Amino acid sequence: QAEESCLQNLASRYLQTVTDYGKDLVEKALAPELQAQAKAYFEKTQEQLTPLVKKIGNDLLNFFSHFIELKTQPAT
């Protein structure tokens, strides 16, 4: 009985060790892939947003310069 319990305990610890090792291995294998996907996503987002942000900035400058021109014109 005691020997059987010892073998079950040993088998249980072995299975837990193998399971933990497998989880660590999967995490290590997926980490670079996920990092690459995240980097590609952020680069694509930046590539798409940069022209939009520049256009918005240009439009705002034009908008405010229009009001400045109205203030500087003499009243008729």
From Swiss-Prot:
PANTHER family: APOLIPOPROTEIN A-II
Keywords from the UniProt entry: Disulfide bond, HDL, Lipid transport, Pyrrolidone carboxylic acid, Secreted, Transport
Record note on quaternary structure: Homodimer; disulfide-linked. Interacts with NAXE and NDRG1.
Main location (coarse class): secreted
Keyword Disulfide bond: yes
Pyrrolidone carboxylic acid: modified positions: 1
GO biological process: cholesterol homeostasis; cholesterol transport; lipoprotein metabolic process; positive regulation of phagocytosis; protein stabilization
Keyword Transcription regulation: no
Species this protein is from: Equus caballus (Horse)
InterPro entries found in the cross-reference section: ApoA-II, ApoA-II_sf
Gene Ontology cellular component terms for the protein in this record: spherical high-density lipoprotein particle
Function according to Swiss-Prot or TrEMBL: May stabilize HDL (high density lipoprotein) structure by its association with lipids, and affect the HDL metabolism.
Molecular function (Gene Ontology), one example: lipid binding
Protein name: Apolipoprotein A-II
Family, per entry: Belongs to the apolipoprotein A2 family.
Tissues expressed in: Plasma.
Cellular compartments annotated: Secreted
